[in-house]
Amino acid sequence: MDNQIIQETVDKILSVLPNQAGQLARLVRLMQFACDPTITVIGKYNHGKSRLLNELIGTDIFSVADKRETIQLAEHKQDQVRWLDAPGLDADVAAVDDRHAFEAVWTQADIRLFVHSVREGELDATEHHLLQQLIEDADHSRRQTILVLTQIDQIPDQTILTQIKTSIAQQVPKLDIWAVSATRHRQGIENGKTLLIEKSGIGALRHTLEQALAQVPSARTYEKNRLLSDLHHQLKQLLLDQKHVLQQLQQTQQQQLHDFDTGLINILDKIRVDLEPIVNIDGQDQALNPDSFATMFKNTAAKQQRAKVQIAYSRACIEINSHLIRHGVVGLPAEQQTTIKSIDTVIVAVFGISVKFRDQLRALFYTDTERQRLQREFRFYFEKSAGRMILAAKIEQTMRQQGCIQNAMMALQQMESAA
């Protein structure tokens, strides 16, 4: 699988699992079959990391200085092993979770060589916290962490040295501890003193590293399969969660619509009953008698009848409007609004401006065609209400998220097949 396809796969997974960038970076590293096993050396500034590396490799590759120089990754390849000198844990521009240090410790490393100077006594809080994280990671990845106590030649009192070792062993009881002196080893090499070389502890540490390196291939296979399994599980669970969310949203959407439609039908039925005394009268409908100039300012029977019709219609509108408000329909959509606020209402949009005659009431509330129109148009404005639009947007977003998760799952399967 080429790098572009791998990156596309990573991007698809990160779009739905944004917190898994570290795990994905490590997985990509493990997918690179030809990469050499990597030993990352971690430790605070001036604890002897670079000097130790030089002795282990057998040549002065890494800079040894009294000032801070390792603020980025320094590496060297030798005998099919890649050595990384990570930024110091207390470097000015690189904290523990700095990008370079994070990459060295969590993405690149197959073996972590944790360096601590015995001159500093026991582990400090930063060192102890990171070691605990590495120990926990070993349970999941089988990557080994080797704790190395350096500069033991600077503690001539063996009793004190033993006390320091014991104290550190109590801090990290799950780790074996290796005590070394790069200075003794260099002096032994330069002066041909075998005893100094043996007492330096470098030989024993090399042997331990050789054993750890022999386990890297199987550890990588285990870790790769574990990461793939974890990602599959997370994606599967996320998809199930999103399906559950979608189901709940759709049920809410359906229930809201059912409640709105049922409530509107009940109100329209009630209005029919309430309007019976108004629309069904014996004799002539006096509301139809037109006004004349002579009766313009008189309270005639025709005006009284029209007033009854208008009051009955207003009461019907109030009942319907109360139902609309209960269900979040409080105004017209923005695209239908005018500059005249008094007519920017759903009632006016559906019914019109005014109803004065009984035939108008009958047409509105007693014909099946008009009733169906009322139900259809009030439902339209219900669906245009803010709450319904937000709910519809959530449903659409959840469905898109499901699609992204499914794409990520397929991409991960393709990556796994290519592994």
From Swiss-Prot:
Higher taxonomy: Bacteria, Pseudomonadati, Pseudomonadota, Gammaproteobacteria, Moraxellales
Keyword terms: Aromatic hydrocarbons catabolism
Native organism: Acinetobacter baylyi (strain ATCC 33305 / BD413 / ADP1)
UniProt-recorded name of the protein: Uncharacterized protein ACIAD1443
GO biological process, one term: tRNA methylation
A Pfam family matched in the record: MMR_HSR1
GO cellular component: cytoplasm
GO molecular function: GTP binding
UniProt xrefs under InterPro entries: GTP-bd, P-loop_NTPase
